[in-house]
Amino acid sequence: MAAAQETSLRADERLVLEWHGDNRNGQTTDDHYGLALQRLTLTGSSGALRTSAQIDGELFWDAPTADYEDAGRLERVAVEYDMPLRGGDLTVTTGDFHRQLGRGLVLSLRRVDEVGQDVTLQGGQLAWSGDTLDVDVFAGRTNAAEFDAVSQHAVNDPHDVVAGGAATLRQLTPLQLSLGVFGMHMRPRESLVPAYGQDHMSALGASLEGAAPSGIAAFYVEADWQGRHVAGDGTMAKALYGTLDLNLGALAVQIEGLWLDDFFVRGSRNSAVGTAFDYAQPPTLERIDQEVIDNTNTRGGRVRLSYALLDGDLVPYANLMMRQNDPGEDTQLDQIHAYGGAEWSYDGGRARLNLSAGARDEVQDGQTFKAMKHAEGDWLSPIGGGHALHISATHEERRLESKAYRRGSSVAGLEKGGLGAVSVEVGYDTSDPSDEVRRLFVAGILAWEPTDAITLRSTVGSQRGGLKCVAGVCRDFPEFSGARLEIVGRGDLL
């Protein structure tokens, strides 16, 4: 008698209630309105079958413009099924799924919650995995989350057609090499000049990855080619990317290089922001939070040195990044960013102190275009009874051409394991000296976990906005002034 298949069903519910007052950013189109956001995510499995669905909705009251739209929809749905095939495992996927080729230069459809980005491919994928060979093919249309969390405006689905595939040969001796090849073809729904016919682009790439058996070294190299046909004109583009990691006892060395020759993948227009969707997210060489305005025509490198002391509890490090945007052109921009710091873990790993500081310069035509000096700190220290103090701070001294300003934020809080935290956040931004624009921001934050299945987080006050970047994805966030309550519930239904 066959064994019963294990079946599960899980629900995750997120409800956000907001009231926006006057954030004093010099605009009136984002003030004095309320908002309720809801997201229900269901995930289930039964034997080799896995399913998921996401239901989203937004409800506004006193909306200042028609751009804030009430809506409700089935945002995501996916079905996966595993089966044995020819000595390997075949996974069949239909519906919505994220997909990346290589390190994201050729294609990167992914979710970046911190900047409100979520694009999937709505279609199908066949993926076969054997002992030393992985192969997959996929096709579908791009499906963007229909609510832009930054502007809080509706997003029209781009429905750009994408098809591609990849193959990876693994465990090639003696360095446990992996050789990968991949490619994709994209046809955007919107052409730049429809009279010249359908825009389209194709890209091919290859990668080689390996590591020494001793663990002393590991590397990754990727080369890509792209052909674009836009408004009747054909363009060829190329890209190279590589990393080398060395573990020399207590010393660790990371080396990274990037060359992009007019390399990008753009689809139809994002109706919420007015620019095209980016379907590729190449590495940037930058620290994850750094502003990256252009990452399509650039070359550069980065090196990071770290040294483990006190049995690895104290790790000082130094990082140097140099890149050129638009090399050899009149608009060439030379960028250099040097920073260093230390990460210290003590009290048996229960406490930590991280400090860093650095400087950045961007020079164009012999003149400093942008400059920044920055410092960051994060301290967590237990104080007994399951309580801990947590303080984090960032500060930036900036100059944009002849304009000097500063911005930063600090958060100080008391945390209780298994219960929650209470914090105060203070931010500042002097980039706009206008009297009607707020420069000091103060907010109180309360997080509470009444049960293992429920988490509440409330924010009251004002919070700094501005340009925020995560791994090269950048958005300009509006300042916030008002109140916000987030309730998250989770539980197993089966």
Model-derived regions, located:
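Signature for the C-terminal beta-barrel architecture of outer-membrane proteins
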Residues: 4-36, 43-74, 81-90, 114-408, ...
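Outer-membrane beta-barrel "beta-signal"
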Residues: 280-281, 448, 462, 477-494
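Conserved C-terminal beta-signal and adjacent last beta-strands/turns
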Residues: 409-427, 439-461, 485-488
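"Short basic amphipathic alpha-helical interaction patches in structured regions
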Residues: 107-112
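Cleavable N-terminal export/targeting peptides
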Residues: 1-6, 492-494
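Bulky hydrophobic/aromatic packing residues
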Residues: 70, 102, 255, 448, ...
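Well-ordered mid-protein domain cores that form the structural environment of catalytic cofactors
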Residues: 90-104, 120-122
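Short loop/helix-cap segments at secondary-structure boundaries that form the rim of catalytic
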Residues: 104-105, 305
